[in-house]
Structures are given as structure tokens and as C-alpha cells.
């Protein structure tokens, strides 16, 4: 695959982050230290205001792109593989979300959770465990947005130097 990387002017990509393949990074999004985004066979779209934190791994499979919605926080060491993440989602430290999984808007995926292939997480879910399970529902959009806004400010500050 020919590399087709698109980074919005207002986005921040740390110099140690690795982007390869067909990747788009939207306005106000950020990709932090040592994150790896590989898309040899399908597109990776990182939405407006989303943050991909340190050491995150994002990868695709044939026919399984990755979409990260607007104002999401994908936290340290998380892995996204061929999945769809709705808007205003927080994915906890070291969580893994696998091929064909769909995480509904406003959800929180707890640290170390393993969301298996093709699992569908309803909007506003709180999810923990390996294998992952929904333990309750709550509207987390505002809290998740506040976290994302923090990273928007950080990204802008890093861009300014």
C-alpha cells in the first residue's frame, strides 16, 4: 500500500509517533510519544479532538479499518485492531479492542479490558474485564470530552514549543 497520511493543520503528532499507510488525523487531534498507527490494508481515521496517547498501537486487517470518533481518549498502551470507536469514548490503559468490535458513543472501556472480535458495546456503557463485559450504563460524554479537551490544549502547547 502506498502511504497516504493526512494530518490536519491543527493536529499534533509527536516526532516519535509512527504513522504508516492510509492514516488521517483530524482537526485538534493528537498522536503522542511512541504511538504506532499502521494501516497497510485498510484506513485508520482519527477523529476531531481525539487523542492517541503514549505507546498506543493501532493496526488494521483486510476489510477491517479503524475509526476513532471525535473527542476520544485512547490511553497509554491500549491496542485498537480493526475496530470502530464511537464519539466521546475513553479507552483505558492497556485495554485491547479487536477486529470488528464496535464501541458505542460515550462509553468507557476499563484498563486491561479485552473487547473480543465483533463485540458490540452499546452507547454509554462502562466495560471491564477479560473478556470484557458491560457492568453498567451512564452518560459519560461530558467527562470524556473534558479529558479530550485537556489533550487538545496539550497538543496545541507542544506545537507552539
Predicted regions and their residues:
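Extended, small-residue-rich solenoid/repeat segments and analogous flexible loops
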Residues: 1-36, 154-161
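Glycine-rich hexapeptide-repeat left-handed beta-helix
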Residues: 1-6, 40-48, 54-56, 61-68, ...
Amino acid at each position: 500500500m502506498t502511504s497516504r497520511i493526512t494530518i490536519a493543520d491543527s493536529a499534533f503528532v509527536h516526532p516519535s509517533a509512527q504513522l504508516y499507510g492510509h492514516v488521517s488525523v483530524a482537526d485538534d487531534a493528537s498522536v503522542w510519544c511512541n504511538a504506532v498507527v499502521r494501516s497497510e490494508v485498510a484506513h485508520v481515521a482519527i477523529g476531531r479532538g481525539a487523542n492517541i496517547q503514549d505507546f498506543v498501537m493501532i493496526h488494521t486487517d483486510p476489510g477491517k479499518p479503524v475509526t476513532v470518533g471525535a473527542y476520544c481518549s485512547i490511553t497509554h498502551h491500549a491496542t485498537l485492531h480493526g475496530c470502530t470507536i464511537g464519539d466521546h469514548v475513553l479507552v483505558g490503559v492497556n485495554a485491547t479492542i479487536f477486529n470488528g468490535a464496535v464501541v458505542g458513543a460515550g462509553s468507557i472501556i476499563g484498563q486491561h479490558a479485552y473487547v473480543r472480535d465483533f463485540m458490540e458495546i452499546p452507547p454509554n456503557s462502562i466495560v471491564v474485564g477479560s473478556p470484557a463485559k458491560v457492568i453498567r450504563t451512564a452518560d459519560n460524554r461530558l467527562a470524556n470530552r473534558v479529558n479530550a479537551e485537556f489533550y487538545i490544549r496539550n497538543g496545541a502547547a507542544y506545537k507552539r514549543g
